[in-house]
Amino acid sequence: MAGKELERCQRQADEVTEIMLNNFDKVLERDGKLAELEQRSDQLLDMSSAFSKTTKTLAQKKRWENARCRIYMGLAVGIALLILLIVLLVIFLPQSSKGSSAPQVQDAGPASGPGE
């Protein structure tokens, strides 16, 4: 009876030992996976930081390009308006000055002298 009881306790101890070894192996495997996940998360963090810097740099570059384009367009419109103003002044100013500077002769009808 004591031998059977001892055998049963030994089997239970062996089962518990086997379960503990399996659990220990699973913990080691899980630890390896966690380390890999941590490494991947660090890589993703680095990549997101680089992406953020690149995005900010690109946005700033595009803003400057857009501002430069607006400045060039404003200058082009300003120059076009200036040229149009000069052309209009050249066309209309000499005609109005010729008409006002030349003596105007008014026709008073048939010439009547003092003796008539």
From Swiss-Prot:
InterPro entries in the cross-refs: Synaptobrevin-like, V_SNARE_CC, Vamp5, VAMP5_R-SNARE
Disordered, as annotated region: 97-116
Places the protein is found: Cell membrane; Endomembrane system; Golgi apparatus, trans-Golgi network membrane
One GO CC term on file: Golgi apparatus
Record Pfam families: Synaptobrevin
One BP annotation, GO: cell differentiation
Annotated transmembrane regions: 73-93
Coarse class of the protein's main subcellular location: membrane
Cytoplasmic domain ranges by topology: 1-72
Segments on the Vesicular face: 94-116
Highest taxon listed in the record's lineage: Eukaryota
Domain v-SNARE coiled-coil homology: from-to ranges: 5-65
Keyword set, alphabetical order: Cell membrane, Coiled coil, Developmental protein, Differentiation, Golgi apparatus, Membrane, Myogenesis, Phosphoprotein, Transmembrane, Transmembrane helix
Record-listed Phosphoserine modification sites: S41, S48, S49
Protein's membrane topology: Single-pass type IV membrane protein
Entries under PANTHER family matching the protein: VESICLE-ASSOCIATED MEMBRANE PROTEIN 5
Function text: May participate in trafficking events that are associated with myogenesis, such as myoblast fusion and/or GLUT4 trafficking.
Family affiliation: Belongs to the synaptobrevin family.
Protein name: Vesicle-associated membrane protein 5
